[in-house]
């Protein structure tokens, strides 16, 4: 029998949500996604010990504000993780713009361009990289500009149709609507358990996928943030799914039949609309789940970025001693 992972690969582009080099080499995804949490975890492994030494040595040679230096070294390390992943996948690696820039379009643009330049310095073309931005109004506006410059973007922390509509308006390359974090919110709010078919996160991604296909929107839908293999199976056929290694392993061991749940041919009419800033902000205001999970996600990524910068500061201090 064919594993569910292999069956999934026939209808969906499988992406690994990890910086674990060994897992990527073993599971052979098409793309990889990273975030500050994943980068921090990867840097804790022996594989990146030399990269840390190199980045710290580079940082020692830089002048200026210590906070700016530690931030630059942290960026360099994130690029090191991304560059290692690029060697292992045929497709793209997503690298995230600092979460603390989520409400600053111009600063997000500057950071995104510097990420692309840093990859180019390592001989990696921009068509191998996706710039990952939070799906705030400001992040979406930054993505709109970057797309016009030929820099493809992955809009993350997406919890609502309002965000998906705004991303479509901006003609972004790819969105990452979250599944598991939506489920978390509803389970906490209602005290209920949900089957995969009832899962509010699954329903949200299906609605967004249908809206895009019904209106011939080219933006790729990549479901993200899974709590179970059941959620993944419920979205089989989605353009892409980014999945953690433990769930990829679970699917690889399961030789049951996988049923396709999503296809462009199955789309239902859903009239195309556009959102301006005030409409977007009002729709988000009316969606408590999306508002809370977006804010929570930004805080969590900012916290892990802060942890990475603190680690870098300590390494720089030790190197200077």
Swiss-Prot record:
Cellular component annotations (GO), alphabetically ordered: cytosol
Main location: cytoplasm
Keywords annotated in UniProt: Cytoplasm, Pentose shunt, Schiff base, Transferase
GO MF entries: transaldolase activity
Localization terms from the record: Cytoplasm
Pfam families: TAL_FSA
Catalysed transformations (reactions): D-sedoheptulose 7-phosphate + D-glyceraldehyde 3-phosphate = D-erythrose 4-phosphate + beta-D-fructose 6-phosphate
EC number, as in UniProt: 2.2.1.2
Domain of life from the UniProt record: Bacteria
InterPro entries per record: Aldolase_TIM, TAL/FSA, Transaldolase_1, Transaldolase_AS
Active site: residue positions: 132
Function according to Swiss-Prot or TrEMBL: Transaldolase is important for the balance of metabolites in the pentose-phosphate pathway.
Protein's name according to its UniProt entry: Transaldolase
Organism listed in the record: Rhizobium leguminosarum bv. trifolii (strain WSM2304)
